């Protein structure tokens, strides 16, 4: 089994609409992300590279210094005070650590699909997102591309 492990740190703001506690207010985090991709044997390009690590890291870094929202947060989406390129819209009902992890997971799967389409390789993709020192969410799925 071969593994690629990529880590990144990124800083964002967010808020949890409808949450009864302090997280309903705009606040920020320094997130730590870790992506592990495993395969029995990775395909290699013509210079024997398996995947472009920078493309995987950029999935996480794209969120750096941006406001994370969902489609329900019309305050940010419709505001003239926020630059559109400073806002990242996540799927789901809130910009939770769970939805950040799935945002990264989906982005990593897109990177694999673009770099090695149609190779029929089975990958295990694991994304770990640490929101705070104590709050971590992990998603792990097998895919064939």
Please provide the spans of the model-predicted regions:
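Charge-rich, low-complexity N-terminal segments
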Residues: 1-145
């Amino acid at each position: 089994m071969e593994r690629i492990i990529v880590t990144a740190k990124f800083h964002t703001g967010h808020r949890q609409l409808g949450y009864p506690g302090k997280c309903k207010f705009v606040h920020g985090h320094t997130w730590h992300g870790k992506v592990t991709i495993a395969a029995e044997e990775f395909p290699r390009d013509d210079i024997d590279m398996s995947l472009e690590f920078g493309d995987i890291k950029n999935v996480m870094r794209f969120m750096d210094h941006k406001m994370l929202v969902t489609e329900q947060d019309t305050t940010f989406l419709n505001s003239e005070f926020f630059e559109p390129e400073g806002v990242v819209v996540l799927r789901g009902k809130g910009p939770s650590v769970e939805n950040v992890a799935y945002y990264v997971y989906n982005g990593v799967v897109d990177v694999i699909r673009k770099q090695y389409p149609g190779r029929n390789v089975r990958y295990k993709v694991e994304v770990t997102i640490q929101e705070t020192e104590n709050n971590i969410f992990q998603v792990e799925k097998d895919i064939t591309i």
